[in-house]
């Protein structure tokens, strides 16, 4: 029996090779996984043309995945530098990479990225419209927007972000809102400008059925973008954000009916006390669709440290329903991240994802922590390094500060609690001098 998408296969009770691979990685029964995909609770972004893909699942009961953003811009147009980031991100086990290139002819980079990457690849076709078409935004037609979407799908992109919750009606309300940061979504702002200048409805909304046909043809997962995500904590959970989410829930249902896999994108900047509510609202009104969040950042006053503000919010979000975290780097709000910024962002986001998985009792999550604890008690430094999310920094710290006693560190020396207790339990003398 043939199928068009992973969702179509799941509805037809077919187990695909991608489902088998994801079930193996997640250590769950493949039939349980298929049922979750059939219900729309899990997606496996897997474009038919992404031949190097090692499939991952995103959604209920699975490990929280992380995404790394990169891409070329007008000020930093260097494909080789971005490919170096790609290689490092994959070495650091990032499950997804989004190509957010927004200047010039980006297809060469996209093709190289997809040809190389075993990680799932996402993109925002809206960013590519001006460069690909060589036209000013206001002059781009609905048909041309579709051309760009199809080009990305044909090239092998596994999931695309499209902003179909932003409508003319909401755009009018935005003119009078007391929001501080208005729209911080780049794609959302471009659509807002196009709609206002042309006095027309969002072209991605009016041509949504055509987009669904493209996605079904190539098995592209839709990541329904939140053009009105809060860009500061003051704007969190306001009427515009919730109205857009309601619109996205309806668009998600239409995608599901056409056998197109779908996940929902979320905030953003959210105070700690509102994060759990945001997760529950999305899961409730969007039929438990996988939730993909940017952060969320829990305060606005830490430029240079937003990988930390994001990790705090990301851990809470992951523990209360988020399935997919978009990384944030120390360079957020300041510049295009360099390689070191990217590494710090990945590590911080992986910590948040793992902390959330422990709280969600994802199989295997706490077990790794228990192994680390046993290694610490045994003062087994090599095992500790092996189990660490990042092994480079602990190895560096250990090497730079060698203790006199090998079975301790320079913090406590002979007064190491683990060392003392082990000696007592083993019947050995405890000599501190």
UniProtKB/Swiss-Prot annotation:
Record: residues binding substrate: 69, 98, 127, 163, 185-187, 226-229, 265, 292
- Database matches in InterPro entries: ThiC (IPR037509), ThiC/Bza_core_dom (IPR038521), ThiC/BzaA/B (IPR002817)
Where is [4Fe-4S] cluster annotated to bind?
A: 409, 412, 416
Q: What's the record's note on cofactor binding?
A: Binds 1 [4Fe-4S] cluster per subunit. The cluster is coordinated with 3 cysteines and an exchangeable S-adenosyl-L-methionine.
Disulphide bridges: none
Q: Into which EC class is this enzyme placed?
A: lyase
Identify the PANTHER family for this entry: PHOSPHOMETHYLPYRIMIDINE SYNTHASE, CHLOROPLASTIC (PTHR30557:SF1), THIAMINE BIOSYNTHESIS PROTEIN THIC (PTHR30557)
Tell me which domain of life the UniProt entry assigns to the organism this sequence originates from.
Bacteria
- Coiled-coil region(s): none
Q: Which UniProt keywords apply?
A: 4Fe-4S, Iron, Iron-sulfur, Lyase, Metal-binding, S-adenosyl-L-methionine, Thiamine biosynthesis, Zinc
Write out the function statement from the record.
Answer: Catalyzes the synthesis of the hydroxymethylpyrimidine phosphate (HMP-P) moiety of thiamine from aminoimidazole ribotide (AIR) in a radical S-adenosyl-L-methionine (SAM)-dependent reaction.
Its pathway is:
Cofactor biosynthesis; thiamine diphosphate biosynthesis
An annotated GO BP: thiamine biosynthetic process
Report the protein name in the record: Phosphomethylpyrimidine synthase
EC annotation from Swiss-Prot or TrEMBL:
4.1.99.17
Which reactions is this enzyme annotated as catalysing?
A: 5-amino-1-(5-phospho-beta-D-ribosyl)imidazole + S-adenosyl-L-methionine = 4-amino-2-methyl-5-(phosphooxymethyl)pyrimidine + CO + 5'-deoxyadenosine + formate + L-methionine + 3 H(+)
Q: What taxonomic lineage is listed for the species of origin?
A: Bacteria, Bacillati, Bacillota, Tissierellia, Tissierellales
Q: Name one GO cellular component term.
A: cytosol
Q: Which Pfam families match?
A: ThiC_Rad_SAM
**What cofactor is this protein dependent on?**
[4Fe-4S] cluster
């Amino acid at each position: 029996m043939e199928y068009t998408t992973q969702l179509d296969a799941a509805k037809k009770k077919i187990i695909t090779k991608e489902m088998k691979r994801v079930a193996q990685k997640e250590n769950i029964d493949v039939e349980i996984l298929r049922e979750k995909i059939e219900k729309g609770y899990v997606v496996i972004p897997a474009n038919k043309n992404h031949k190097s893909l090692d499939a991952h699942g995103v959604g209920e009961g699975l490990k929280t995945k992380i995404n790394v953003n990169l891409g070329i811009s007008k000020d930093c147009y260097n494909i080789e530098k971005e490919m170096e980031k790609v290689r490092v991100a994959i070495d650091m086990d990032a499950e997804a990479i989004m190509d957010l290139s927004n200047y010039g002819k980006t297809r060469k980079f996209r093709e190289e990225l997809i040809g190389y990457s075993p990680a799932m690849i996402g993109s925002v076709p809206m960013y590519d419209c001006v460069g690909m078409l060589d036209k000013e935004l206001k002059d781009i037609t609905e048909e041309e927007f579709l051309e760009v979407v199809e080009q990305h799908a044909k090239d092998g992109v596994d999931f695309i972000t499209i902003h179909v919750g932003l409508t003319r009606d909401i755009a009018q309300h935005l003119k009078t809102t007391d929001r501080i940061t208005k729209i911080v979504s780049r794609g959302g702002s471009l659509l807002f400008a196009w709609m206002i200048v042309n006095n027309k409805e969002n072209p991605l909304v009016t041509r949504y059925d055509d987009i669904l046909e493209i996605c079904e043809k190539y098995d592209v997962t839709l990541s329904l973008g939140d053009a009105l995500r809060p860009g500061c904590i003051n704007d969190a959970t306001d009427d515009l954000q919730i109205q857009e989410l309601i619109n996205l829930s309806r668009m998600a249902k239409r995608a599901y009916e056409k056998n197109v896999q779908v996940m929902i994108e979320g905030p953003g900047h959210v105070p700690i006390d509102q994060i759990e509510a945001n997760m529950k609202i999305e899961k409730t009104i969007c039929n438990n669709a996988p939730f993909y969040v940017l952060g969320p950042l829990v305060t606005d006053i830490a430029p240079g440290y937003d990988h930390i503000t994001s990790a705090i919010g990301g851990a809470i979000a992951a523990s209360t329903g988020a399935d997919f975290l978009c990384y944030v780097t120390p360079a957020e709000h300041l510049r295009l991240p360099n390689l070191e910024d990217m590494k710090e962002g990945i590590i911080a986001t992986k910590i948040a994802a793992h902390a959330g998985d422990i709280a969600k009792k994802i199989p295997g999550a706490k077990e790794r922590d228990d192994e680390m604890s046993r290694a610490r008690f045994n003062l087994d430094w090599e095992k500790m390094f092996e189990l660490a999310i990042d092994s480079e920094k602990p190895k560096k710290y250990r090497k730079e500060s060698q203790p006199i006693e090998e079975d301790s560190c320079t913090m406590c020396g002979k007064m190491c609690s683990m060392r003392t207790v082990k000696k007592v339990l083993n019947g050995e003398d405890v000599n501190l001098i």
